[in-house]
Amino acid sequence: MSGGKSGGKAAVAKSAQSRSAKAGLAFPVGRVHRLLRKGNYAQRVGAGAPVYLAAVLEYLAAEILELAGNAARDNKKTRIIPRHLQLAIRNDEELNKLLGHVTIAQGGVVPNINAHLLPKTSGRTGKPSQEL
């Protein structure tokens, strides 16, 4: 007889799974946790805080990259450059508010011409004049 109470099947060893994989995230939960601990933001850091923060950062990155990809496609380009990031952020109301004081290197400016500076179009629709 073998020692131990439990009979039946032997316990199958589980392979190690990262916290990012458990949460279904691409961003590194372990690294975010380490940065929160080393950053002196608080004396203690809960277990759920780095998971939540990594999820928020992943969502923001995905949102910005999707809009920048659309801007690149509109300009018939396949590579996202800083100009596309600038256009994506400045044309989105919420992202512009969040990143309002951020300067993007090589981003340029958003094209905008004041309506007063545009040439005035005539209101006539092409009726011939009655003058001789």
UniProtKB/Swiss-Prot annotation:
Modified residues (N6-acetyllysine): K5, K9
Phosphoserine modification, residue list: S129
Motif ([ST]-Q motif): 129-130
PTM sites of type N5-methylglutamine: Q106
Localization per record: Nucleus; Chromosome
GO biological process, one term: double-strand break repair
GO CC term, one of those recorded: rDNA heterochromatin
Location (main, coarse): nucleus
GO molecular function, one term: protein heterodimerization activity
Cited InterPro entries: Histone-fold, Histone_H2A, Histone_H2A/H2B/H3, Histone_H2A_C, Histone_H2A_CS
Other noteworthy facts: In contrast to vertebrates and insects, its C-terminus is not monoubiquitinated.
Function: Core component of nucleosome which plays a central role in DNA double strand break (DSB) repair. Nucleosomes wrap and compact DNA into chromatin, limiting DNA accessibility to the cellular machineries which require DNA as a template. Histones thereby play a central role in transcription regulation, DNA repair, DNA replication and chromosomal stability. DNA accessibility is regulated via a complex set of post-translational modifications of histones, also called histone code, and nucleosome remodeling.
Comment block on domains: The [ST]-Q motif constitutes a recognition sequence for kinases from the PI3/PI4-kinase family.
Subunit composition and interactions: The nucleosome is a histone octamer containing two molecules each of H2A, H2B, H3 and H4 assembled in one H3-H4 heterotetramer and two H2A-H2B heterodimers. The octamer wraps approximately 147 bp of DNA. Interacts with mdb1 (via BRCT domain) in vitro; this interaction requires phosphorylation of this protein at the S/T-Q motif.
Protein name: Histone H2A-alpha
Lineage: Eukaryota, Fungi, Dikarya, Ascomycota, Taphrinomycotina
